[in-house]
Amino acid sequence: MSKRLLLFDFDETYFKHNTNEEDLSHLREMEKLLEKLTNNNEVMTAVLTGSTFQSVMDKMDQVNMTFKPLHIFSDLSSKMFTWNNGEYIESETYKKKVFSEPFLFEDIEDILRHISAQYNVEFIPQRAFEGNETHYNFYFHSTGNHSNDRRILEALVRYANDQNYTARFSRSNPLAGDPENAYDIDFTPSNAGKLYATQFLMKKYNIPVKSILGFGDSGNDEAYLSYLEHAYLMSNSRDEALKQKFRLTKYPYYQGITLHVKEFVEGKYDY
């Protein structure tokens, strides 16, 4: 039997921000299953997240997660870390691929200034940026008109593309600490993103798409989930449009992941 690959978005998918005592038993059950499948060499696991690597580590510590996914792709999958001999090591191979093209904060500032001036809107940095970043993320607060929001954001994506930069947008998730009625704006190198990370792992391990199961809950999961044959949107997702597009987990959060991973490795989704 060929090995299977399990892919998880992190915030509000693999990790519930408001994990309570009742949730902990479901979390432990999920981790126990993933540990068993990993030790039996049945699956490989990877987290694909927009969060920074340190943020992922801190959140795992909050709920005392013990299972270590083999790979963590942080910063909207622009950085890759692999569990090796008791610690996570950043992949130099992946880093070289990410930085194969110019990616400068000054260029991104110019792009945002252009759109800000054209539409009289503001883009707010989500954090303090350091030098040589691989992911720059901003908030855009809704104008109050969904169609107008999309018009502005699609213009941003087009203009960024004209400057040879990759920009993405998705609705912010207040459950993950984002503001209400806002959008996440993400700039990454072209060789980055959750879909790119998925295809990188497929090539690295020679895994066909039919042997992959993916989970997500928000707009930045849409591209990679759409690429997979076996993909689930978390039933706790707040994105109504995505709920119409993808199969929903039977249960939210840890329970949902546990059930569908079990069914997947048992071959119930094979055809």
Swiss-Prot record:
Keyword annotations of the record: Hydrolase
Example GO molecular function: phosphatase activity
UniProt xrefs under SUPFAM superfamilies: HAD-like
EC number: 3.-.-.-
Matching InterPro entries: HAD-like_sf, HAD-SF_hydro_IIB, HAD_sf, SPP-like_dom
Key word Transcription regulation present: no
GO CC annotation terms, alphabetical: cytosol
PANTHER family with a match to the protein in the record: KANOSAMINE-6-PHOSPHATE PHOSPHATASE, PHOSPHOSERINE PHOSPHATASE
Family as reported in the entry's similarity comment: Belongs to the HAD-like hydrolase superfamily.
Descriptive protein name: Uncharacterized hydrolase in edin-B 3'region
UniProt organism field: Staphylococcus aureus
